[in-house]
Amino acid sequence: MGNDKRVRKPEWLKISIGANERYTETKRIVESHCLHTICSSGRCPNMGECWGKGTATFMIAGDICTRSCKFCNTQTGRPLPLDPDEPAHVAESIALMKLSHAVITSVDRDDLPDLGAAHWAQTIREIKRLNPETTTEVLIPDFQGRKELIDQVIKACPEIISHNMETVKRISPQVRSAANYHTSLEVIRQIAESGITAKSGIMVGLGETPAEVEELMDDLISVGCKILTIGQYLQPTHKHFPVAAYITPEQFAVYKETGLKKGFEQVESAPLVRSSYHAEKHIRFNNK
């Protein structure tokens, strides 16, 4: 995967992390409870903004993934056993942060018989038990398309369930380890058919065309997806899939307009958008 012709990062992608008291307090709570966040492990460009507002996306089931997607910075390897205290720790941290809306994601745990589904469900239930006024959004793996495992998450009743398509159909096999485009669509269909709001996210700048992005939008609409996030792919290290192009803010605006015209209820589309960016706005809109 040579990357001799690196694309220069444009000015609109240069950000300042910045820190305020809320950022420092959020960081303290996360570290004191030995929690993992996708904010830090995924090197999210919005960490300063989100932590500064007292929000964070918690990553459960450890911080070592059994898959090795070519776009992702999360560590790959043999994960440790699940921590039975983690659901309680996450719920307690949400209470300490006084979050009105919590976002949870996880690594893939293909090493476990149930792929981590029971741990997922227990975490959601514990959050709701300790924080009855807090709404939850969960960004789940594909659970290898096993409907009975996805049902465990659905039955825990989060307000929004998200599963990321990540990229267009043509590029998906090149960058998604052990994942399948059509399996992901079926995961989203199952979520939507349950009555829970279905959400998905994609990256652009991997070499896709606008026509392919529109095709992906059509596929998502056809299975009942209501919320879509679109952000610029940023290559974590030289070993990862190279950036093919930096998409302009103007093109992101076009994608947003196109998505809304196609029938999505909400579209977040901008260079620094990530899956959980402005998630608190999505739940407020969803509850109207």
Swiss-Prot record:
CDD domains: Radical_SAM (cd01335)
InterPro entries: Aldolase_TIM, Elp3/MiaA/NifB-like_rSAM, Lipoyl_synth, rSAM
Subcellular location, record wording: Cytoplasm
Alphabetical list of Pfam families matching this protein: Radical_SAM
Entry cofactors: [4Fe-4S] cluster
EC identifiers of the protein: 2.8.1.8
Cofactor: how and how many bound: Binds 2 [4Fe-4S] clusters per subunit. One cluster is coordinated with 3 cysteines and an exchangeable S-adenosyl-L-methionine.
Metabolic or biological pathway: Protein modification; protein lipoylation via endogenous pathway; protein N(6)-(lipoyl)lysine from octanoyl-[acyl-carrier-protein]: step 2/2
Domain Radical SAM core: 51-265
SUPFAM superfamilies assigned to the protein according to its UniProt record, in alphabetical order: Radical SAM enzymes
UniProt binding sites for [4Fe-4S] cluster 1: C39, C44, C50, S276
Binding site for [4Fe-4S] cluster 2: C65, C69, C72
ATP-binding found in the keyword field: no
A GO CC term attached to the entry: cytoplasm
Keyword S-adenosyl-L-methionine: yes
Record key words, sorted: 4Fe-4S, Cytoplasm, Iron, Iron-sulfur, Metal-binding, S-adenosyl-L-methionine, Transferase
HAMAP family: Lipoyl_synth
Family as reported in the entry's similarity comment: Belongs to the radical SAM superfamily. Lipoyl synthase family.
Protein name per UniProt: Lipoyl synthase
Source species: Bacteroides fragilis (strain YCH46)
